[in-house]
């Protein structure tokens, strides 16, 4: 089974790190290799341009792929988006020079030139907004085009807005919100690799569910149990186990990482002791 992943760019490292958290580790010893073996038997990583991944998966050259949602939309590829990931978040925006004294798209009256690598997204957006524009298709950095005089405005990806600001631009409208996504060929369910793909998807979902969660173990005296349980948030309910030769219980629960200090303070005040907090690798439902 082949999975297409980015060979460079802002998604490459997060994708490799995510797959490692899932348990899929590639052998990247040869920087020139385009097909990378992994520790999963029969699973290979195909290193390609992020924007090419949707068409590669659509063609069946790879059963799975991880790319940006924006590239799936731009390519019009007929693929299944199976999982939206929690990284690679960005927006496709219409950005104009800060010197333009406008705050809304509707204030653009004259025909303008717009530089973008998102030709299809731009075309649909401009038609929808009834903006008269000539699209200047590029493959490199769009934000420099207005200062070069090659365009009046741009449609491009924005993460924080810092790069736009550095080039004297401001976002005027958000066209599309994007993040990394796991995509599959439409026929993946019928393929010989369906079982392997299903297992991989299960592990991916498990790794995502475990993000920013911690497991807490604590010992609670019998007479304090109800009070401690009442103070606990939980995915369902805490797990209880009677301690041998003791009038106490072991209580186990899963908590969002941000809530850890608050939870520890509450359960300790209510009588819990021997509190242990551990990382969670995966949560498989």
From Swiss-Prot:
Q: Where in the cell is it found?
A: Cytoplasm
Question: Which family does the entry's similarity section mention?
Answer: Belongs to the ATP phosphoribosyltransferase family. Long subfamily.
Give yes or no: UniProt keyword Cytoplasm: yes
What name has this protein been given in UniProt?
ATP phosphoribosyltransferase
- Gene Ontology CC entries for this record: cytoplasm
GO MF annotation list:
ATP binding; ATP phosphoribosyltransferase activity; magnesium ion binding
This protein's encoding gene? hisG
Which catalytic reaction applies to this protein? 1-(5-phospho-beta-D-ribosyl)-ATP + diphosphate = 5-phospho-alpha-D-ribose 1-diphosphate + ATP
Q: Which domain of life does the protein's organism represent?
A: Archaea
Which organism was this protein described from? Answer: Sulfurisphaera tokodaii (strain DSM 16993 / JCM 10545 / NBRC 100140 / 7) (Sulfolobus tokodaii)
Described function: Catalyzes the condensation of ATP and 5-phosphoribose 1-diphosphate to form N'-(5'-phosphoribosyl)-ATP (PR-ATP). Has a crucial role in the pathway because the rate of histidine biosynthesis seems to be controlled primarily by regulation of HisG enzymatic activity.
Cofactor(s) this protein cannot do without: Mg(2+)
Q: Mainly localized where?
A: cytoplasm
Question: What Pfam families does the record tag this protein with?
Answer: HisG (PF01634), HisG_C (PF08029)
Q: What InterPro entries has UniProt attached to this entry?
A: ATP-PRT_HisG_long (IPR020621), ATP_PRibTrfase_cat (IPR013820), ATP_PRibTrfase_CS (IPR018198), ATP_PRibTrfase_HisG (IPR001348), HisG_C (IPR013115), N-reg_PII-like_a/b (IPR011322), N-reg_PII/ATP_PRibTrfase_C (IPR015867)
């Amino acid at each position: 089974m082949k999975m297409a992943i980015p060979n460079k760019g802002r998604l490459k490292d997060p994708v490799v790190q995510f797959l490692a958290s899932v348990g899929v580790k590639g052998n990247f010893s040869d920087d020139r290799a385009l097909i990378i073996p992994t520790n999963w038997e029969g699973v290979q990583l195909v290193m390609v341009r992020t924007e090419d991944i949707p068409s590669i998966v659509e063609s069946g050259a790879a059963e799975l792929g991880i790319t940006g949602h924006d590239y799936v939309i731009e390519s019009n590829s007929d693929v299944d988006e199976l999982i939206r990931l929690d990284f690679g978040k960005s927006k496709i925006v219409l950005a104009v020079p800060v010197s333009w004294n406008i705050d809304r798209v509707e204030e653009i009256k004259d025909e303008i030139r717009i530089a973008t690598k998102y030709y299809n997204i731009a075309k649909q957006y401009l038609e929808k907004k009834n903006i008269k524009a000539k699209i200047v298709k590029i493959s490199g950095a769009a934000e420099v085009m207005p200062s070069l005089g090659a365009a009046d405005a741009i449609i491009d990806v924005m993460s924080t807005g810092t790069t736009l600001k550095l080039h004297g631009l401001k976002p005027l409208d958000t066209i599309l919100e994007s993040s990394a996504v796991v995509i599959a060929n439409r026929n993946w369910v019928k393929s010989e690799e369906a079982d392997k793909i299903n297992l991989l998807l299960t592990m991916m979902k498990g790794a995502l569910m475990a993000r920013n969660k911690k497991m807490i173990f604590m010992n609670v005296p019998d007479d304090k149990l109800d009070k401690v349980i009442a103070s606990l948030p939980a995915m369902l309910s805490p797990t209880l186990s009677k301690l041998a030769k003791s009038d106490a219980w072991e209580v186990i629960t899963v908590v969002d990482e941000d809530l850890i200090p608050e939870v520890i303070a509450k359960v300790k005040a209510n009588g819990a002791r021997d509190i242990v907090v551990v990382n969670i690798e995966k949560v498989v439902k």
